[in-house]
Amino acid sequence: MEDVREGVDELDRELVKLLAVRQGYMEAAARIKPTFDDVRVPWRVEDVVTKVLQSAEKEGLSGRIAEPVWRELIECCIAHEGEVWKKLRSE
């Protein structure tokens, strides 16, 4: 069991690195988008989820895991992007 836990811990560390990269893209988007209304783009949310579900199916990841995880990730990223957008324009 310990080797399984170590494997999960290593994957978590890798996921954190990848999420940090994703966060950087959200921060770049906040710098580029001209209005706060541009932070949330509903069609893009659905586009991302569709692509993720296609990738999940190819990789053997259950959609019951992938979809809610990505929807929450997207919501957190949108919130972060919005905060960054506001901060950049208040300086």
Located regions from the model:
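Domain-level signature for soluble enzymes in the chorismate/prephenate branch of the shikimate pathway
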Residues: 1-91
